[in-house]
């Protein structure tokens, strides 16, 4: 075994907990420092009005056997398969997501549909050569008109910048290999392909007690293996060894300094670098990296499920909300026998936006007004509201962000005794499965002396083998 024995993990989200669990199983002493009072990070589940809800929609899907095996090891049989239904709301019309040809044709009308097809054909005949930005990347695959209808407004709500200023990496990671042709083929030739694009997956595994149940159980297992989780314990800074033989340290906000053999950090990379004695150039690069915040407005609705989807994407520019989750349509067990429906409207902003500090009653009033505007809920059906603010949810892939991230990546990678993982820590737009994989491989680098490049793991990661979770466990898929 590697001589490293005592490991500190900053953050109890999917990445940090997965690393801690694997190391604890291998006999390491692990201590987790979590700034909040709960585990799970963005994937935690909370109790609200007698029901269980997540911080927005958190489906789980992976084709990596290591991730799926860990997920099943933790959750056991306490999950159900959910048939996914998500649609796009645009100008008071619902469009199937992923695209179905007839649905789009009737939804947009013959004239608009003809223009969309013409625009798509033009993009195939005369593609724009420089695909550095999101708008060009998507337009080349869907046509400019479909881009303007189904991508532009939503993306600009989410990121708070023009699509011309959004790096193509976002599209390449999230909708890689997907185009209008592929979407139509998937809709028309059902079952033609054994491997669906992740965006098109129509069934997913969901724990009976919410997405966060996986991480609650993982935390229990870590504790039973001798690990320690410190709640409400934000880390101020990481102090790395200056001389050979010295241990890296963490400094708490109270000023306490603790030594470890290795530190795994999932705290925001900007915060990590900003509080370390690093060269000015590295600090300047880190300061150019920004995160987007989320405001979640939950509404208790006295009605049966207002719509059949698990969530809908709101592309209408006249509404500020970008996504609406309906927790009535996940699994019955999270309802705890309650008849009311809980909806969650998502809004996105920066720290500097006045919206971020808007009072709770104003946010609830705005969300109530907007859900009425959609026509999904009647005026008198909203009975209560609750606001949760989640800072630094989304790493913003502004055009040219890599020229700032790569020097920071290289600098941190060369530091002994430190691993950086997770959506916050690595500035990667990860799903749960990629953060879990980061944690697993970070643990292997320590316990097995592996040399996994953790920076390579994100939604663009290619798996050597493929499997998926089904109602009866793992199902292996032939990649040939």
Which residues does each PLM region occupy?
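N-terminal Rossmann-like FAD-binding beta1-loop-alpha1 element of flavoenzymes
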Residues: 5-32
């Amino acid at each position: 075994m590697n001589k490293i024995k005592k490991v500190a993990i900053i953050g109890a989200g999917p990445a940090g907990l997965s690393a801690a669990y694997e190391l604890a199983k291998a006999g390491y002493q692990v201590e987790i420092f979590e700034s909040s009072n709960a585990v799970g990070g963005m994937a935690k589940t909370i109790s609200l009005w007698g029901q269980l809800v997540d911080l927005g929609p958190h489906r789980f899907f992976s084709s990596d056997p290591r991730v799926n095996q860990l997920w099943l090891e933790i959750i056991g049989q306490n999950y159900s398969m959910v048939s996914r239904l998500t649609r796009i709301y645009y100008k008071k019309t619902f469009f199937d997501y992923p695209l179905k040809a007839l649905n789009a044709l009737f939804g947009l009308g013959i004239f608009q549909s003809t223009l969309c097809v013409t625009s798509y054909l033009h993009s195939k005949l005369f593609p724009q050569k420089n695909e550095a930005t999101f708008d060009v990347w998507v337009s080349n695959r869907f046509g400019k008109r479909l881009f303007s209808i189904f991508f532009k407004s939503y993306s600009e709500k989410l990121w708070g910048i023009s699509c011309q200023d959004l790096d193509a990496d976002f599209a390449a990671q999230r909708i890689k290999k997907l185009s209008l042709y592929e979407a139509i083929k998937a809709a028309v030739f059902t079952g033609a392909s054994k491997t669906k694009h992740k965006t098109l997956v129509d069934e997913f595994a969901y724990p009976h007690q919410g997405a966060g149940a996986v991480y609650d159980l993982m935390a229990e297992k870590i504790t039973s293996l001798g690990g320690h989780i410190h709640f409400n314990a934000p880390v101020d800074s990481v102090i790395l060894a200056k001389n050979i033989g010295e241990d890296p340290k963490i400094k708490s906000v109270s000023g306490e300094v603790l030594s470890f053999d290795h530190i795994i950090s999932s705290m925001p990379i900007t915060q990590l670098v900003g509080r370390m004695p690093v060269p000015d150039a590295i600090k300047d690069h880190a300061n150019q990296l920004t995160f987007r915040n989320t405001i979640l407005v939950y509404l208790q609705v006295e009605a049966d499920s207002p719509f059949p989807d698990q969530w809908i994407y709101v592309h209408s520019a006249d509404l500020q909300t970008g996504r609406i989750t309906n927790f009535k349509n996940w699994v019955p067990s999270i309802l705890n026998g309650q008849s009311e429906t809980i909806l969650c409207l998502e809004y996105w902003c920066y720290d500097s936006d006045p919206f971020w500090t808007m009072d709770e009653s104003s946010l609830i009033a705005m969300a109530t007004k907007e859900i009425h505007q959609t026509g999904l809920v009647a005026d008198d059906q909203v009975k209560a509201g609750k606001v949760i603010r989640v800072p630094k949810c989304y790493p913003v892939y502004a055009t040219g962000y890599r020229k700032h991230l790569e020097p920071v990546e290289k600098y941190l990678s060369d530091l002994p005794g430190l691993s950086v993982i997770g959506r916050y820590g690595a500035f990667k737009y990860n799903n749960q499965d990629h953060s879990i994989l980061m944690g697993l491989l970070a643990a292997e680098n320590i316990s097995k002396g592996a040399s996994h490049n953790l920076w390579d793991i994100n939604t663009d990661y290619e798996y050597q083998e493929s499997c998926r979770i089904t109602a009866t466990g793992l199902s292996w898929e032939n990649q040939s």
